[in-house]
């Protein structure tokens, strides 16, 4: 009976170790595709760099755009206002030139957004070619910018400082005006 108890204990420990190793490899994999600081973005302060993978499979880092203004749009597939404003977002991105860049972010599994695979499959049916859609699977970027509703916009200046975070709808003219006023 003691022998049986010992064998049972060893089996349990082995199973727990395998589970932990599996969790560790999953976390390492997530770290490769997503590096986001939990630092809160504060107006007038430098924002933390992030690294996210886009729906297109490319890696995007905020630091790659140093010297350019960044229009960062957080949105969701279920948000009708977000969907209605995507054509304007696409047009703004198309006209960006060297002055600014447009990045959009979705957070699968957070705030009602569908799972990542479902989102990517759904997004394939849309035809927006001028802006990347970055995937924030942990929701950390969403959190760091204080996103409580969709859409939410963040404007980052050429030095990487947060100029403004604006929840709710902004039309094309308001977005372009904000970018222009950033200098």
Q: What does each of the following model-derived ranges do?
A:
Residues 1-47, 183:
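N-terminal targeting signals for export/organelle localization
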Residues 49-70, 94:
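A short beta-strand-turn-helix
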Residues 68-70, 75-78, 149:
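Short pre-active-site segment immediately N-terminal to redox-active cysteine/selenocysteine motifs
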Residues 74-91:
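Conserved redox-active cysteine motifs that mediate thiol-disulfide chemistry
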Residues 100-114, 130-137:
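Thiol-based oxidoreductase modules, predominantly thioredoxin-like and allied folds used
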Residues 119-156:
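Short, internal strand/loop/helix patches
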